[in-house]
């Protein structure tokens, strides 16, 4: 068991007489103190942490081995203490080196002086064969990682301080540099004044035999009270409980301790370090200042051991690296104007460097005449309301004006002064009463049919033409020329070029340069054109990427050539003859249709009746139109047809193939007969062949009819069933008639008597509308199956009245009570007595096996009752 005591240095103790040699200052570890025998002597003095211990040779050797094992002695020290003697060459070399004045430091010189004085005292007191070993108490310095620049010098001084017979010991690794006894209880450093050291040597006390007996019973390490020293710069917590001590260590009671206080000369800052600290930047710690790695909940038990990894300086952080060390250089004002001219700042005006330093007069100049501030528009548009008194005063001021008296704003002027006295101004009306026969609405849109309005407009038109020159739009003026030499429908002069395809209008819609660009040659890159032809689709053409590799014409078709038939499906259905086939004649039929459409439009716009149009075509007046007359009429209508197209048109209109176009054929193929109904007098002329009635003004302009009949009575039919208007019957070509033996393939299926009906044929696949399975009450979001309860396209285009009102199928089939059904019938206007309603309810409840009634059942019952009542009425009649 090792115990540690700290006792103050007694001043009245005498040196021990039993010692064979003078005790020298030194320290010992607990393990070393326990190895000492009863012959150990400890001497304390005021030198820092000094102890004198007397050891036997055996104990001395044991202590040497313990020192080597514990690692408390440096290799150089071990060589000097154990293996090296005075006659050893290395020892002599080291002594010569240390004796040179260049290597010696002030502290080493002081130590050398002390050692000389101690040697003098040793020779005086040396009188026995007891081996004495001196233990030095020099401590290691604070920085454990050899990071401080003054470490080499300190180790030299430490070595010199212990280069007397004895050795330099260090505290165990992990031991802190500050102990609870070190705060406030330190003295002067060992490297102090040599005179003070001499005084301390003369006052060396000696411990008596009582102390030896105590040491023999239980080894103890007695630590003498050191002088006051400067505190180390950094504290390292050892994790042990610290004992609080007063500021002055004068208590005679011994205290326990595990830490040896280092001397102040080891902790004192060197002048080089002070200069380096002064050169560091403010707010940044120097790189050589090492802090403990662990400063949180864990303790660094071995602060002297180097830590793993790279220890970065604490002061250098990202903010320090990103902060500019030196301020930016400022551009001189003389050069700034040139820089601003070439690279103006964002949002700044580019100013020429020649006038950059000119006085700024333009911003303060104001051009024009300064106008006076008038009333703002806000006050004029929305003035502040005035009081009633102010309004009265304003009206009184304006009442003197004549305009205010005769035409006041918003009301009529006072007419009382100009009226006779006693006149009832409220009930008296001046002027003649207006008879309101017809309203403006009836004048603009009279409540009459179109036919009646048209007849009223035509009545008296011939008289208005003579009296007022009132002609209809597009009506030709009748100049009463001699019809024998002049016909009013003939055309004279040079014909104006006209095209119905709108090419002239297309020219007016484009600028001249656009038309010239269209006529100009379009230059396209051959590479682009080849790429488009090979890879891009074209309208109406099949994409053929390898067309350029084929040495064939563009319209070439590979494979066996199949000659198409002359007839098509339509020719087979209508059973046309070989000369009447329509296949391959689409262009020809299109041209004929275009000519017919143009003639129909001319006849409708220029003639009021079909008879007048037919008379225009019938130049000879024989009641038929031949080929020459048709060509003349086409020329008058600006249709210059070639011989082939004219023959096709004439052949199309001549249904009976007699070489002439009669009135019925003309009305069917060259006019819109449905838009020009047959008039009564026109019917008499066509059927009876009589002359026109001169008393009727509508028939006065009609030329004398031919005695031959133009139509048969059966050719005139009603325009619509039940209508009074009449029109001509529609002609059908023999080729348009469908054969009576024509039957479809679907009609021939199952035509055999006794065959299996088509409903019994097996069906394959899943039906589109799944009416075979019931629809779920709650459908999933992902369920897109049609169960037949949803509406189709017809229901969307033509919704029922129920859908328009928001009533759906589930509302019809929902079970309802008797009171609810009664309210629904009353709301829709169906009034039933109580007996009738009970009868309807009973019939509807019988339709369901559980007696439930819905709106659909009530509706079906009402329909059945109504149908039964109608059948009874028919039977009674």
UniProtKB/Swiss-Prot annotation:
Residue span, EF-hand domain: 605-640, 641-676
Coiled-coil ranges (or none): none
GO BP annotations listed: calcium ion transport; flagellated sperm motility; regulation of calcineurin-NFAT signaling cascade; regulation of store-operated calcium entry
Cell location: Cytoplasm, Cytoskeleton, Cilium axoneme; Cytoplasm, Cytoskeleton, Flagellum axoneme; Cytoplasm
Keyword rRNA-binding: no
GO molecular function: calcium ion binding; calcium ion sensor activity
Highest taxon, organism lineage: Eukaryota
Disulphide-bonded residues: none
Chain positions recorded as Ca(2+) 1 binding sites: 618, 622, 629
Coarse class of the protein's main subcellular location: cytoplasm
Tissue: Expressed in trachea multiciliated cells.
Pfam families: EF-hand_7, EF-hand_EFHB_C
Residues annotated to bind Ca(2+) 2: 654, 656, 658, 665
GO cellular component, one term: axonemal microtubule
Span list, region Disordered: 1-47, 268-290
Keywords of the record: Calcium, Calcium transport, Cell projection, Cilium, Cytoplasm, Cytoskeleton, Flagellum, Ion transport, Metal-binding, Repeat, Transport
Subunit structure: Microtubule inner protein component of sperm flagellar doublet microtubules. Interacts with STIM1 and ORAI1; the interactions take place upon Ca(2+)-store depletion and dissociate through a Ca(2+)-dependent mechanism. Interaction with STIM1 inhibits STIM1 interaction with SARAF.
Function: Microtubule inner protein (MIP) part of the dynein-decorated doublet microtubules (DMTs) in cilia axoneme, which is required for motile cilia beating. Cytosolic sensor for calcium, modulates the interaction of STIM1 and ORAI1 upon store depletion and the activation of store-operated Ca(2+) entry (SOCE) and NFAT translocation from cytosol to nucleus.
Protein name: EF-hand domain-containing family member B
Species for this entry: Bos taurus
